[in-house]
Amino acid sequence: MKTVSQLIDMKQKETKISMVTAYDFPSAKQVEAAGIDMILVGDSLGMTVLGYESTVQVTLADMIHHGRAVRRGAPNTFVVVDMPIGAVGISMTQDLNHALKLYQETNANAIKAEGAHITPFIEKATAIGIPVVAHLGLTPQSVGVMGYKLQGATKEAAEQLILDAKNVEQAGAVALVLEAIPNDLAEEISKHLTIPVIGIGAGKGTDGQVLVYHDMLNYGVEHKAKFVKQFADFSVGVDGLKQYDQEVKSGAFPSEEYTYKKKIMNEVNNND
């Protein structure tokens, strides 16, 4: 399992960091088997595996449930679990209680929290021993206000993002996720920080990349963002399901190959 210091060492050696967002035991098991460096249990699970319309409906209980499953599937991978909407920003005491609960009950290596406004929370969480990954740029919990669009696209917005990135590092963040920002801006931020910067839709100038398991494997998704490359096609599973349906209806399944050979009814009938 990678440690924070090893991830920082990878950045210093210019070794790119791979990260995949996964939500359950089997996907986490596959991600670990593939040798991926980090797993993110993102609150995007609300739309991807729970069928919610947005991340707004995702609860702390949801994140704990899925975080535990991922940890069981990937016991030797650096796992980061999202703080869902409403878990940060109420009061510092409550925020830290939520963070501690999520961190302890999932056995994660770090938690992730969105936005530039959470630097005081990062400081306090770090002080009590909870590693925090920050998330700037497009933050899914704020799309109701920001919309799904490129962030940092003006001079003022870019300058603010650079400042925000420096602030979250100074507050104690162990890594930073940058989402949907210009490539050159992401590269500039990565150069100026000592912590690893993981990009999603932020070009190749970051220290690593993250994609969602279901997006990159075309597994049950209808719409994919511009920055998503499909590396395999799990949608072919539908063909297998159709064949199963046909074989059940025709009686072709189960054949003898898939049937236990022991006969018992003669013994039952002889006892009558």
Curated annotation (Swiss-Prot):
Binding-site list for 3-methyl-2-oxobutanoate: 43-44, 82, 112
Subcellular location: Cytoplasm
Cofactor binding comment, as recorded: Binds 1 Mg(2+) ion per subunit.
The keyword Magnesium is assigned to this record: yes
Catalytic reactions of this protein: 3-methyl-2-oxobutanoate + (6R)-5,10-methylene-5,6,7,8-tetrahydrofolate + H2O = 2-dehydropantoate + (6S)-5,6,7,8-tetrahydrofolate
CDD domains per record: KPHMT-like
A GO CC term attached to the entry: cytoplasm
Pathway: Cofactor biosynthesis; (R)-pantothenate biosynthesis; (R)-pantoate from 3-methyl-2-oxobutanoate: step 1/2
Pfam families, sorted: Pantoate_transf
Active site: 179 (proton acceptor)
Keywords: Cytoplasm, Magnesium, Metal-binding, Pantothenate biosynthesis, Transferase
One term of GO molecular function: 3-methyl-2-oxobutanoate hydroxymethyltransferase activity
UniProt binding sites for Mg(2+): 43, 82, 114
Cofactor: Mg(2+)
GO BP field: pantothenate biosynthetic process
Function recorded in the entry: Catalyzes the reversible reaction in which hydroxymethyl group from 5,10-methylenetetrahydrofolate is transferred onto alpha-ketoisovalerate to form ketopantoate.
Quaternary context: Homodecamer; pentamer of dimers.
Protein name: 3-methyl-2-oxobutanoate hydroxymethyltransferase
